[in-house]
């Protein structure tokens, strides 16, 4: 049996048709969902690019004890285990931070595209004019360059290859599958789409513009938490740009789904589609991940698993699951022994319908920023570390997280606060011992 993991960046669950009504067109993800087990309550244990991937390749939590950082020498990447088990391993990535974060470990082939979104344009190449774009006041210079880098890199890809980057990557992956279709393989496809900056080509760029007549500012990379710059129509425009980027990603990855079918790999391949996190687009007074607010629009993630004959089509698992569960699931399916130290659990019994006890609580957060806990009956407690006071929501009746119940339910809030910090205890002990040993 083969394993393919497709990780898309910045996919909001509420924008995907398989999860509920939306104006956004995602027919290919929806088609995959109709053949899969859909996990309705999957969360990123830390909704940020590299920490989320660290959780998904090591099976360990990051929000408790480590910031955004590269894999350490002692971290075991799941690809290393598949390689040791005799699998052919490969990864294709246009996510700009992966190569510098040691995400190539265990892969016999690691193809990283040098002209992806937000990657520095090669020296000696003049950046294209981007004066048509609006950047909010106070925009960091480093991030200000992300858009001209992205715009110029896309032009380089088109000039050198005649293709958009998602198209190029999907075609490269399809070619790799053609070459290795007779072998047992573990393949990781890591796409930065539909992450900002939004320099989406037509027909997707204007597909969702309000009334198709927006004449306001072009905002390819908005910024929060200060939203004082927002003018009427701006946020509808920002949503439209994001929606177009998601539909573009859906289009190209639909081609990859087709290739898997055409190469007759479908019946013998576990296909996992997961997003690393979502994105705030003004719902709680902020845009993008600044401060890592762990509201649903950021922390709730897409997770689908397909294996015909073993995973029932159109099935759903309603229990709480985390991206930290992904590697244990893959190892379980492949019959590879789980190493000590993994902190998730296999979701295979949930995917197959055999039955998996529902987790009573799920923990998530962002190291040194905030932490939270979601309960099986739908409550969500957020410890903001004193920044703006704690929050408590009843998600079944308040999915948008607008009615803070912290004053109405102090006993429940206190209980969840204690549970959250009890969950942190092993790491607090570990870190304090490390500090003590370092001072000797």
Task: List the predicted regions and their residue ranges.
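Catalytic domains that recognize anionic headgroups
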Residues: 1-440
């Amino acid at each position: 049996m083969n394993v393919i993991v497709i990780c898309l960046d910045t996919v909001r669950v509420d924008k995907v048709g398989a999860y509920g009504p939306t104006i956004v067109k995602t027919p290919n993800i929806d088609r995959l969902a109709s053949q899969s087990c859909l996990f309705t309550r999957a969360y990123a244990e830390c909704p940020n690019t590299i920490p989320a991937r660290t959780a998904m390749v090591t099976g360990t939590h990051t929000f408790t004890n480590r910031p955004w950082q590269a894999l350490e020498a002692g971290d075991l990447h799941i690809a290393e285990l598949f390689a040791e088990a005799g699998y052919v391993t490969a990864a294709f990535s246009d996510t700009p931070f992966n190569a510098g974060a040691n995400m190539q470990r265990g892969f016999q082939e690691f193809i990283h595209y040098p002209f992806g979104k937000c990657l520095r344009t090669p020296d000696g190449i003049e950046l294209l004019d981007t004066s048509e774009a609006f950047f909010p006041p106070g925009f960091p210079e480093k991030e200000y360059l992300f858009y001209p880098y992205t715009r110029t890199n896309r032009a380089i890809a088109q000039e050198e290859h005649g293709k958009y980057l998602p198209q190029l990557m999907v075609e490269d992956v399809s070619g790799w599958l053609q070459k290795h279709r007779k072998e047992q393989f573990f393949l990781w496809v890591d796409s930065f789409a539909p992450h900002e900056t939004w320099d989406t080509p037509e027909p997707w760029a204007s597909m969702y513009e309000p009334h198709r007549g927006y004449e306001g500012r072009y905002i390819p990379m908005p910024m929060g938490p200060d939203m004082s710059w927002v003018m009427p129509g701006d946020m509808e425009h920002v949503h439209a740009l994001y929606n177009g980027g998601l539909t573009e990603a859906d289009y190209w990855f639909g081609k990859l789904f087709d290739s898997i079918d055409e190469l007759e790999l479908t019946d013998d391949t576990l296909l996992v589609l997961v997003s690393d996190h979502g994105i705030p687009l003004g719902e709680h007074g902020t845009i993008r991940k600044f401060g890592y607010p762990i509201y649903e629009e950021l922390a709730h993630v897409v997770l689908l698993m397909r294996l015909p004959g073993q995973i029932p089509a159109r099935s759903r698992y309603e229990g709480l699951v985390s991206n930290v569960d992904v590697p244990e699931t893959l190892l379980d399916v492949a019959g590879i022994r789980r190493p000590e130290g993994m902190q998730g659990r296999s979701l295979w019994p949930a995917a197959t319908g055999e039955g998996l006890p529902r987790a009573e609580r799920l923990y998530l957060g962002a190291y040194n920023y905030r932490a939270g806990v979601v309960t099986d009956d739908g409550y969500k407690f957020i410890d903001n570390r004193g920044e703006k006071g704690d929050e408590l929501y009843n998600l079944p009746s308040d999915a948008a997280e607008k009615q803070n119940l912290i004053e109405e339910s102090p006993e429940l809030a206190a209980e969840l606060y204690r549970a959250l910090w009890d969950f942190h205890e092993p790491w607090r002990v570990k870190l304090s011992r490390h500090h003590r040993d370092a001072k000797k």
